[in-house]
């Protein structure tokens, strides 16, 4: 009996380290970034050709000036990776970085030897927003094919738990999750997908979407527990209920929906950094735009947000929109209101604008490190706000409709049971969340805001 010879295992190609990364925006080479060996930080310079176009991708901290170089030795490394903030902003956070580390390990690089330039090169043209990086060190493109969501959930959970093995099947699983999971920010496991609303088919969405497909972001349900987040089984439904409630309150958001499979409810939101025909929009979080480190607790304020909007000369309507979101976060107890959860958008040929709201959900843990109080202050307070606090901020920044905005938001959040029922949130959980809503902000009760006593359940759903 003859046997076929075993197919030899193929070694992955050796990884080539990156010394300089060229940055592109809308097909134009805008500059390059490299390590300054003296300081140990990364320095960026715009190209002379780009400097003549009048486009400002980072107007507050890196204005486009011929011959100017930018290096920021005062920015905390944990957040900005020794990079200029505009570039660091395009790197993924915990989940995406863990996947990149796993991929690099297969290439023979341990985590300590992977530089910020390596990570930018890995992102290539996969990053959120419109910036692209060359050379590219990411896996080669694959032909778009359908993804089985339940399999992807399993792979994401293994990636979160660090239990992906090194056999051939594990490598294939890693490749699948890499195709969807290394672009989006935030600690929670997310997938960047292309979704066909007619056929319900899902494909990897980091590159161009095919005809009939749209760019969406999916937050995985069923990922287990987290020290800060606690039980995670209802996060998708809660966030969807908050989306319905925010829309009713007049908050501007991209389309959202639930994708249900095998008893799980995954929250989906349409990407606002993509437009028709795979158009890409340039993005900056508030964290990057104004160097407001989102990891610094007890430091940042909503006043800094409105000062940023004023410096960018945004119109009144967008300042009112930002105010509406602030009030919604306070009344709805979304304490995960850090500077990476607010973004500005630049569409090609247009001016900077406030991006749609995102990561709007119930997020409060009285014993949590991050969400026992708000992460941005109002009138010097991080909790126990009064209507007067909100109105004083409004007066300072010329929000003349503030009182009406507050009352509209309170009226919508008072209808929480209706929105929770529409999203399928369990009654007892919906009741617990309602106990934390700060409805005393309404015109009929403008006293100090405090959570209802006796509530012991907590949730934190957006980090």
Residue ranges and their predicted role:
Residues 1-339, 343-463:
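Phosphate/dinucleotide-binding and metal-coordinating scaffold of catalytic cores
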């Amino acid at each position: 009996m003859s046997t076929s010879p075993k197919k030899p295992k193929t070694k992955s190609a050796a990884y080539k380290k990156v010394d300089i990364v060229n940055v592109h925006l809308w097909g134009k080479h805008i500059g390059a970034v490299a390590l300054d060996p003296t300081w140990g930080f990364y320095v960026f310079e715009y190209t002379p050709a780009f400097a003549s176009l009048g486009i400002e991708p980072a107007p507050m901290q890196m204005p486009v000036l011929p011959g100017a170089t930018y290096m920021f030795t005062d920015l905390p490394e944990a957040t900005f990776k020794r990079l200029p903030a505009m570039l660091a902003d395009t790197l993924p956070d915990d989940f995406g970085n863990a996947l990149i580390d796993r991929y690099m390990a297969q290439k023979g690089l341990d985590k300590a030897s992977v530089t910020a330039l390596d990570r930018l090169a890995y992102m290539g043209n996969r990053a959120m927003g419109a910036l692209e990086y060359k050379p590219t060190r990411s896996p080669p493109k694959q032909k778009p094919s359908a993804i089985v969501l339940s399999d992807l959930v399993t792979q994401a959970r293994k990636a979160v738990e660090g239990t992906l093995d090194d056999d051939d099947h594990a490598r294939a699983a890693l490749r699948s999750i890499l195709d969807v999971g290394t672009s989006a920010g935030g600690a929670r496991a997310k997938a960047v997908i292309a979704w066909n609303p007619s056929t319900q088919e899902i494909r990897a969405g980091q590159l161009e979407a095919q005809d009939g497909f749209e760019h969406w972001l999916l937050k995985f349900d069923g990922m287990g527990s987290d020290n800060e987040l606690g039980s995670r089984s209802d996060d998708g439904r809660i966030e969807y209920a908050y989306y319905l409630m925010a829309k009713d309150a007049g908050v501007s958001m991209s389309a959202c929906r639930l994708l249900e499979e095998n008893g799980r409810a995954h929250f989906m939101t349409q990407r606002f950094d993509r437009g028709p025909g795979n158009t890409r929009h340039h993005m900056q979080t508030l964290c990057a735009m104004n160097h407001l480190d989102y990891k610094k607790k007890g430091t940042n304020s909503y006043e800094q947000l409105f000062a940023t909007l004023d410096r960018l000369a945004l119109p009144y309507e967008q300042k009112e929109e930002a105010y509406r979101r602030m009030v919604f976060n306070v009344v709805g107890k979304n304490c995960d209101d850090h500077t990476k959860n607010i973004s500005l958008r630049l569409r090609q040929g247009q001016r900077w604008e406030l991006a749609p709201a995102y990561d709007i959900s119930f997020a409060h843990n009285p014993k949590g490190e991050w969400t026992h109080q708000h992460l941005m202050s109002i009138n010097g307070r991080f909790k126990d706000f009064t209507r007067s606090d909100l109105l004083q901020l409004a007066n300072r920044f010329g929000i003349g409709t503030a009182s009406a905005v507050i009352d509209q938001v309170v009226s919508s959040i008072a209808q929480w049971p209706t929105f929770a029922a529409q999203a399928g949130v369990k009654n007892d959980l919906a009741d617990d969340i309602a106990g934390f809503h700060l409805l005393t902000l309404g015109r009929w009760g403008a006293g100090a805001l405090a959570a209802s006593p006796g509530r012991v359940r907590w949730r934190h759903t957006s980090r």
